[in-house]
Amino acid sequence: VYNLVTKRATCEAGATMEWIDGNIGSKVTMKYPAVYLLGEHSRGETLSIAFAGEGQHQDAGSKMVHAAPHTSSSIISKSVARGGGRASYRGLVQVQEGAHHSASSVKCDALLVDTISRSDTYPYVDVREDDVSMAHEATVSKVSDDQLFYLRSRGMGEDEAMAMIVRGFVAIASSSPMPRL
């Protein structure tokens, strides 16, 4: 299965768009939800979680375009790769001329479950305005033998210990906000 998706939204003044994105199971995923912040005080958020197993490439991320003043955006991307799977983050944050006092935060974290899996990060930031706040952070970590040893010494089997580590890594998804009514 090839999962090639285009998702776009525009936000006018005071509006908020929240993408919650999950990617699992397809051989190839290429998905980058986009938010165009066209009105003052609009906000875009993306929370993306991807799991890449054997023979899979999950290429996910987000695009935020700040086209008005006082806009804000947040991208949180979590990926897990195992069995030789490949997880990639590909994102764009663009602040156009005139979008002063805009702010953006990008955080992408990857967890490699074994030594044959791979993670890549391709961030792109294009700022054309002086008075903005921009932050980008990326981490790639590996499940350590110490983590597994600790949990196994507490009576867990290896599969159960690994599952607990992965669940802890993606715990941000369980604390995502509920829809506002």
Language-model segments: which ranges?
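Conserved beta-strand/loop scaffold segments within soluble protein domains that form the structured core
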Residues: 1-156, 170-172, 180-181
